Amino acid sequence: MFEINPIKNRLQDVSERTNILRGYLDYDAKKERLEEVNAELEQPDVWNEPERAQALGKERASLEAVVETIDLLDQGVEDVDGLLELAVEEEDQETFDEIEPELAELEAKLAKLEFRRMFSGDHDASDCYIDLQSGSGGTEAQDWTSMMLRMYLRWAEAKGFKVEVIEVSEGEVAGLKGATVRIAGEYAYGWLRTETGVHRLVRKSPFDSSGRRHTSFASAFIYPEIDDNIQIDINPSDLRIDVYRASGAGGQHVNTTESAVRITHVPTNIVVQCQNDRSQHKNKDQAMKQLRAKLFEYELQKQNAEKQANEDAKSDIGWGSQIRSYVLDDSRIKDLRTGIENRNTQAVLDGDLDKFIEASLKSGL
């Protein structure tokens, strides 16, 4: 005899949780909006306004992720229930054995959709920037900053996000003094926002001939890209704009023209840089976009005293504001906020960050 009750209980659980999500994620409204967006994208003149068309395409992908997944879950429950009936009726072990992998796949899809509930912040759906800055530790810290850049790039690419390196500042001997990256994709800021903070590395330094253990620090600061419709008032007299020759991953034109741009907002001392284009004008536009986003985040922090003052934390990158410790000799990476550990240090440095990120989001950080 087949053990059908556990299967029936799991099917009922999937069905009930799907119905909860249907209401929570406003399935009916999203399905109606998806039809409207599809109709608009089918219009022959839609690409007369490229920015509008791109925004619609992004909205469609977001809507489909909810609507199509719920449709698949509904259909999947029906299909598995049908398989169960057939297996029992025909007393067919082979058919019964097909149920477990199909049901497990449904449960995985459901868990992934449920995780979207973590992205409830006002700007979680936005693209974002990652600012990395080396701290205490000299060359070792600068090498650690370059390792962190690689780690986040690997993570983002594995997630299917679009990655753009906006600016890098080379270290004096090796590594990076700092870097800025733009991450574009669904819930990019939602995924990364809890990564803001100081990351501590402990290892035997390749830059120390004695092979001693060194401790070094680098910070990550994550902030959302803001919609052009949001009004951010910037007084031109508050800005100091410097141009310089690009000095890193900027292509063949590096060090040949002063195309790189650095903008300092004097009242807040916020600095943004861009060197990823040949055109000084384009680099200035991108830097201003970053500045608007940083000022927006800065104002949010001022209004919400409970929110960690990330920009202040950047000024003292050391022991005080760590979020994660990477102890390579002991094969141990530990998140100091959630207690989550991973002993596969190479996998983490290769971008396997989901375990840490998901735990921090679930804990409400």
From Swiss-Prot:
Residues annotated as signal peptide: none
Q: Which InterPro entries match?
A: PCRF, Pep_chain_release_fac_I, Pep_chain_release_fac_I_sf, PrfB
Reading the lineage from the top rank, the first entry is Bacteria
Tell where it localizes: Cytoplasm
> What are the entry keywords?
Cytoplasm, Methylation, Protein biosynthesis
The main location is cytoplasm
* Gene Ontology cellular-component annotations: cytoplasm
N5-methylglutamine modifications at: 252
PTM notes = Methylated by PrmC. Methylation increases the termination efficiency of RF2.
Single GO molecular function: translation release factor activity, codon specific
Q: What does this protein do?
A: Peptide chain release factor 2 directs the termination of translation in response to the peptide chain termination codons UGA and UAA.
Q: Which family does it belong to?
A: Belongs to the prokaryotic/mitochondrial release factor family.
Per its record, how is this protein called by name? Answer: Peptide chain release factor 2
Source species, please? Aliivibrio fischeri (strain ATCC 700601 / ES114) (Vibrio fischeri)
